[in-house]
Amino acid sequence: MVLLILKFHGESVKIKPECAICIIRQVVDAANEITDDEREQFRLIKSTMEVIKDVYGESAVPAWMGTVVHRYLKKISNNNDPYKNLKEKANKIALQYLDKVREMSNTDDELERLRKKVLATIAGNVIDFGAYSTGINIEKLIEDTLNGELKIDNSRKLLNDLKDKNIKKILYICDNAGEIIFDRVLMEEIKKYDKDIVAVVKGKPILNDATLEDAKIAKIDEIAKVITTGSDIIGIILEECSEEFLKEFESADLIIAKGMGNYESLTEYEDKIDKPIYYILKAKCKPVAENIGVDVGDNVLLKR
C-alpha cells in the first residue's frame, strides 16, 4: 500500500491516544452513509482499520491521517462522495436560516458586528445540520452561538487588518458544506472594506468538506473568486495543492482559515508563512483545545 508521505515543518497538533476514537467513529459514520448493508459495513470498517494501524502514531498529524484513511475508504467502497446526501441536506437547512443569521448578526457597532459575523460562521460549524430533525430548535442553537463568546477574541486585530489599505487580497479557506452558507455572511462584511476575497474549497470530495458545488449553492462566486485546493486532502497540505492554489496562497495579504482541519495542517507551515493568519473554529476535541490553550467547546478567533 502506498501511503501519503509528507515533510512537515513546524510545531502543530499531533496525534494523541484519544484520536483513535475519533478516526474510528468517522469510519463507522462513513460506512453507514455508504451502505445500509451491515455485512458490507463490517467489511469496510475492518479493512480500513488495517490502514489506521499503519498511519496511527504519535508523530502523525490528524488531518494527514484522516486523509489517508478516508481516501482508502472511498477506494474500497467505490464511492467517491460518501457524504453527498448529508452535504445536500446541510446546505438545504442552512439556506433556510441564512437571512435570519444575517439579521441576528447585524448591529450598528462596527467591532461587535464583525465579532457576530465571525460567530455566525462558527454557528455553521457548531450545528451538524444533517443530524437534526424538525424536532430540534436549530434557530435557538444559532442564537445561542451568536450570543456566546469568543474565548480567544482577536476581533479588534481583524478589524484593524481589514482597515489596513496595504491588505488587499484575503484568502478565505472554507471548511464544511452547510457551514459555507454562513461563511457568506462574514465574506459580505469583509467586502465592505474593499477587499478582494479568494474563497477556497476542496478539489474533490472528502468527508463533508465543501466543494465547488457547495460554493455555487452558497453563491460564494457572487462575492469572491472561488478556487479549489486541487486535491481531496483534509485541511491544507501545500505539497498536494494545485499551482492555482499555491499562487493565490503566495499572493494573498491575509489568510482566514475555518475549522480544526485547517488549523491542524496550516500550523505545520507557520514558520514559513510571512502573512497574518486568522483561525476561526470551535475547539471540539482535547488535542486541538490544548494546543490552542482553551477548553473543549470554546469558540476561537485566533491571529497567528
UniProtKB/Swiss-Prot annotation:
Recorded protein name is Uncharacterized protein MJ0202
